[in-house]
Amino acid sequence: MNNDVRELRTRKGLSQGQLAQEMDVSRQTINAIETDRYTPSLPLAMALARFFAKSVEEVFHADDEQ
């Protein structure tokens, strides 16, 4: 699953650690999401989308979409 988390995070001027703190997860979790090594749980995906004022579909994309 592809995502725009890194782009959205950097637009807000946040480090991975800062976003992790906001989401109550580890920095390593944010890194794994950004590098497509980890697909977040639905609650985490929803929290990330809400944080960035986007829909889940705007943040996360199927592998064949962009």
Language-model features, listed with the residues they occupy:
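Residues in the helix-turn-helix
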Residues: 18, 29, 58
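Short basic helix-loop element that most often maps to the first helix and adjoining turn
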Residues: 3-22
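Short, charged recognition helix plus adjacent turn
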Residues: 50, 58-66
